[in-house]
Amino acid sequence: MRQRSILALIAIVTLLNGCKSYNHILENIYDKDQSVREWTVGMASLSADEIAEYSNEMARTDSLNQTTVFDILDKEGWPSHLSDKANRAIWLVIDHSDASNRIKYLDLVKVKAEEGVLSKSDYAILKDRTLMENGLAQIYGTQIKMAATVIGEDITMQLYLWPVTDATALDSLRNTVGLSPIEEYLKTSSDAVGHVIVWDRTKTVEDF
C-alpha cells in the first residue's frame, strides 16, 4: 500500500514537472512569435530592404517554433494543464504555419475549443482561413483578402471581406463563437490597418 502511494506521488511530481517544462518552452515560443511581428505595426514606413530583412527573420523564427511545437503535438499530443499563454502559443504557431499544417491540426484545434482550452473564436478563425485557402466561402467572416480593382486604365488595390456562406446569418454565426458583429469588426479592422475593408455582398470566390 505504502509503495503504491509513493509511486502515485512520483507520478504526480513527474506530471507537474512536465507541465512546468512545457509551459516554459511554449511561453518562450509565444514571446518569440509576437516579438518578431512587432515590425509589422510600422510596416508602411519601412523600405523594401527592411521589409525583406524582417520577413526573413520572421520566417526563420516561425520555422524553429513549428519544429518544436509540431514535435510535441505529434509525439505527445496536446499537453494538458498548460497556462493560457502556452495554449495560445500552440494556436499561434499552427496559425502562422503553412496551409497543410493548418488543415492537419484543424480538428485538434476544434476539440480544444470545445474543451475550453482555446476560445471558439480561435477555431473559427482557423476554419475560415482553411476554407479561404481552398477557394471556398468562409463561415464566420474573419478573413480579409486584397484584390485589384480596375477602373479604365487605373488599377487600385482594395481590401475585401472574403465571401461568406450565409450573409444574413453571419452575425448570428459570429455570436456563437464569441465574435463581434461584422460591421463592428470591419470598422475596428479598417482603423487598425489604416485602410477601409469593403464587404461587397455581390462578390463570390470566383471574383478573387
PLM ranges: what are they?
Residues 144, 183, 188-207:
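Catalytic cores of secreted/periplasmic lytic hydrolases that degrade extracellular macromolecules
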Residues 1-26:
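Bacterial Sec-dependent N-terminal signal peptides
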Residues 51-59, 91-97, 156-161:
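Second-shell loop/turn segments in exported
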Residues 20-79, 87:
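Start-of-domain marker
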